[in-house]
Amino acid sequence: MKTIAIIGFGFCGKTLFIKLSKNYQPKTKILIFSKSHYSLSSAAFSELSPSYILNVPAKKMSAFLDRENDFCDFLEKYHSTLWTEIGENGFAPRYIYGQYIDYILEAALVEAKEKAVDFEFINQEVVRVFEEGELALELENGDCYEVDDIVLATSFKQAQMPFEFNSKNFVKDLWSETSINFHQNPPLNKTIGLIGSGLSAVDVILSLKKNKFIGNIIAISRHGNLPKKSFLSAKVDLIKVADAKNGVLFLCLKIRKFLRENPQFDLRQVIGSIRNITQELWHNFDEKNKQLFLRRLISYWNIFRHCAPIDSVEMVENMIIDGQLVVKKGSIENIENVGEKISITTKNEEILVDHLVNCLGFEFRADKYRLLSQMMSEQLLKKDCIMVKSNHPKIHLLGGLNIGRDFECTAVPELRLSVSDVVGKLL
């Protein structure tokens, strides 16, 4: 009997189970370890707020490599009014994508039972992975399981400020259960501060606006930049995989020269044009150039790569014009309670708000994840240039955990490939 352990049951864990079940091999047992019940979509795709929308067009959001229209077909069948409105190039609400993931999972569970797939869902957190002759997992309740293969499909958590701060008016984790009241019953005539000005901040701003918010919003981030508008791809044939051998500086100069000579394009189109070869470019950079990119260019990449729907950005821009939204550039040095207010201190000023929301992105420091830290201490994982990599032939990483190896690996198109690759190794 071969035992496969899946740790984590978000998008990657669910789609991995679906593919393993569909291609089930006899004498295989699948163990799924997650604190969340298997039929529930993750918080990021739940109904916390119907205003939160995907940042990728519907036509690119199928969970399956071999069924490219699967999500679009789901929309057309179960949300026909929305489908008529947005079409394949539109952006669906996140909670509807959560419904889609639940839908395909439920169908897979029915099929798995019909095929007598041997699987078990264990509602426990894995706190230790070790090897004593065989690979084994220890759970928070002390139970241990010996397994043959381990797939780490754990999700990223949200980054936090480097100092402690607590307040009933501080949303520390945007996707936690404790944030439900803020999402569903937001304060409508207060001053709200946002830590960060990326896609999560845009989500919160739009949700407040659609809830008839009449107060003021102050977004604070290191660079003070908002996401750019999404666009229909223009034909740009500039960067080749072979260019990677010349290094990051060469690529920057090549792009700068092109944009100077072709003012009808901007950096979004150039970055969009290398979408399908980003991983190959990253694989062909040496360690020196990877570190140079991460040190000097990653913030600009994030601004121009991670775009928001045009309607969303225009609504945010109108709020800035109307004075309802202010975006400030600065590093936060301290946050403290001052009476009923929250004081945010940057290098240049003190900002007072009534409520504060953490809109920072993912946490990429491996030592902030208990299980990853433990596995590194056991030498089952190794630190790489961003996160971690496997140091054991029977431990496989899925999705965003491969960011150091692949760089571009957190969007659904890359996640599907990652899942397919791991399935090929397991079967």
Q: At which residue positions do the language-model features occur?
A:
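N-terminal glycine-rich dinucleotide-binding loop that anchors FAD/FMN and/or NAD(P) in oxidoreductases
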Residues: 46-70, 235-250, 311-317
